Each structure stands twice: as structure tokens, then as C-alpha cells.
């Protein structure tokens, strides 16, 4: 699997946004602006949502002509109840919501890359990614593994 996600902090909403930034699938790049942070409301997903592409573990809105929804880390409390979530991440996000200085934006982005995405990008493992986006995008996965049903329609 050769998918990459861009991790951006949106200071206006104080959320961390994840967006797919490229794909190796018949040489076609993902549509949508690569530098802009998506709007708060999810875009409408067209009928041709790109399910034929080889990417696994990304919601169908990743291939929308309007651009993908932000996969937002909005609920530290939700993550605290998740078995596989690293123990210090909910604390970091909770402190940020209280306005306490805990990590710089660069450090926070590096934390997500090192602890969340390395295994997913290099080995094709999506389990940890799905754990962290429980409170984010609600569109269905392109090819969800059998028991996983995190991205369900609203």
C-alpha cells in the first residue's frame, strides 16, 4: 500500500485534520485541494466515489471531487475508552482543550507520524488509524475489513 496522509493542525477549530495526499493507483492522484483544510461539514460523495481504486482503509469521501472530509481528532474522552489508544495521547489533547501548553504543532505532527502512521503506511495496517478516527469522518470505508464498521453513515 502506498497511501500517504497529511496531518495538519487547524488552530481555528483546534482539531487535527488528516487528509490523503496521494495514491499509487493507475497513476491517478486524489482529487481536491492538497493545501486547503476541508470545511467542517462533510462534502457530498458522488456516485462514482473511487471504490475501484486500490487504497484500503480510507473513507469513500477521500475520492470525492469536493475533496475528502477531515478525519478529526475531536474527542479525547472517546479515545480514552479505546483499548488500543496510547495512554498519553488523550491527555495531550485534553490539555490542549484547556489551553495548556503541552506540545508544539511540529511535535504533535511528528507524534502522529511516528506513533500512528508508520506501521499503516509501511505495512498496510489500518487498525490503529481506525482506532484514532472513531470521532471523525462518518463515510463508509472503501474496502473495510470484515468486523470493522467504524465509518458508518450518519
Swiss-Prot record:
One Gene Ontology BP term is:
symbiont-mediated arrest of host cell cycle during G2/M transition
**Is Phosphoprotein given among the entry's keywords?**
no
User: Do you know which InterPro entries this protein is assigned to?
Assistant: Transactivation_prot_X (IPR000236)
Segments for region (Mitochondrial targeting sequence): 68-117
Q: Where in the cell is it found?
A: Host cytoplasm; Host nucleus; Host mitochondrion
What the entry says about post-translational processing?
A fraction may be phosphorylated in insect cells and HepG2 cells, a human hepatoblastoma cell line. Phosphorylated in vitro by host protein kinase C or mitogen-activated protein kinase. N-acetylated in insect cells.
Q: Name one Pfam family in it.
A: X
- Highest taxon of the lineage: Viruses
Q: Which residues form a coiled coil?
A: none
Task: Describe the function of this protein.
Answer: Multifunctional protein that plays a role in silencing host antiviral defenses and promoting viral transcription. Does not seem to be essential for HBV infection. May be directly involved in development of cirrhosis and liver cancer (hepatocellular carcinoma). Most of cytosolic activities involve modulation of cytosolic calcium. The effect on apoptosis is controversial depending on the cell types in which the studies have been conducted. May induce apoptosis by localizing in mitochondria and causing loss of mitochondrial membrane potential.
Matches recorded under HAMAP family: HBV_X
In its UniProt entry, what is this protein called?
Protein X
Q: Which organism is it from?
A: Hepatitis B virus genotype B2 (isolate Vietnam/16091/1992) (HBV-B)
- The gene designation is X
Amino acid at each position: 500500500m502506498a497511501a500517504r496522509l497529511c496531518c495538519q493542525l487547524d488552530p481555528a477549530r483546534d482539531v487535527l485534520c488528516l487528509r490523503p495526499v496521494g495514491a499509487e493507483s493507475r497513476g491517478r492522484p486524489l482529487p481536491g485541494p492538497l493545501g486547503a483544510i476541508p470545511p467542517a461539514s462533510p462534502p457530498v460523495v458522488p456516485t462514482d466515489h473511487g471504490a475501484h481504486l486500490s487504497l484500503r482503509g480510507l473513507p469513500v469521501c477521500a475520492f470525492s471531487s469536493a475533496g475528502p472530509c477531515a478525519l478529526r481528532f475531536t474527542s479525547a474522552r472517546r479515545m480514552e475508552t479505546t483499548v488500543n489508544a496510547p495512554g498519553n495521547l488523550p491527555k495531550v489533547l485534553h490539555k490542549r482543550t484547556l489551553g495548556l501548553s503541552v506540545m508544539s504543532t511540529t511535535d504533535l505532527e511528528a507524534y502522529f507520524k511516528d506513533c500512528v502512521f508508520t506501521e499503516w503506511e509501511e505495512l498496510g495496517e489500518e487498525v490503529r488509524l481506525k482506532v484514532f478516527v472513531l470521532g471523525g469522518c462518518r463515510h463508509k470505508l472503501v474496502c473495510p475489513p470484515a468486523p470493522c464498521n467504524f465509518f458508518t453513515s450518519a
